[in-house]
């Protein structure tokens, strides 16, 4: 997966965590019932605006609200977690699909880049949170035991909230996909 350089340390941390974790869950709201539905998604790229790009079949998006989606990535072995709230847009551009194509997508899109329903789903970050302990299970278990014995908070890892800047919302799609 290609990860572009981000404009701040926190945004870069989020991009790196998502890249390291790999597959995440995307949650969208059903327009008719209001129910939330989730499915696993494998990111293809994280662009310079911390937008996450995926392949999907266009028909799988019918009936879902794309103006508010959630992406959740979890790596319990390393106590790393990311939650991204954003807006999704569908990109039908063949050049973008070709640029992002990977043989890993072949099981879902048998016809390759020419698959008639293949689109890129680009989720633009509005806000995100991450938790990262960046330590082994043994260290975390020791820290928890110490915390219980000492009666003090565990204080293990980092939790941050990040929101995008307004300037991100005005860049052209052409520049992002070039």
Q: What are these model-predicted stretches?
A:
Residues 62-127:
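Short, structured beta-strand-loop surface elements
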Residues 32-41:
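A positional/architectural concept
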Residues 1-25:
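Active-site-proximal "nucleotidyltransferase
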Residues 55-57:
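Short His-Asn-centered micro-motif
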Residues 48-52:
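Short active-site oxyanion
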Residues 10, 44-45:
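N-terminal "first-domain core" detector
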Residues 16-33, 69-73:
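A short, Trp-centered hydrophobic/proline-enriched beta-strand micro-motif
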Residues 2, 116-178:
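C-terminal edge-of-domain segments
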């Amino acid at each position: 997966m290609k990860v572009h350089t981000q404009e701040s340390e926190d945004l870069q941390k989020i991009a790196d965590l998502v890249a390291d974790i790999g597959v995440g869950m995307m949650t969208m709201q059903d327009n008719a019932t209001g129910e939330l539905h989730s499915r696993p998604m494998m990111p293809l790229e994280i662009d310079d605006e911390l937008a996450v790009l995926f392949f999907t079949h266009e028909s799988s998006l019918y009936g879902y609200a794309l103006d508010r989606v959630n992406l959740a990535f979890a790596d319990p072995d390393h106590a790393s977690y990311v939650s991204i709230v954003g807006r999704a847009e569908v990109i039908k551009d063949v050049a973008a699909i070709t640029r992002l194509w990977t043989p890993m997508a072949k099981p879902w899109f048998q016809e390759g880049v020419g698959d008639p329903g293949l689109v890129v789903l680009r989720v633009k970050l509005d806000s995100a949170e991450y938790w990262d302990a960046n330590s082994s299970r043994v260290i975390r278990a020791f820290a928890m035991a110490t915390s219980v014995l000492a009666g003090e908070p565990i204080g293990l890892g980092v939790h941050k909230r990040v929101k995008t800047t307004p300037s991100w919302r005005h860049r052209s799609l052409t520049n992002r996909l070039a």
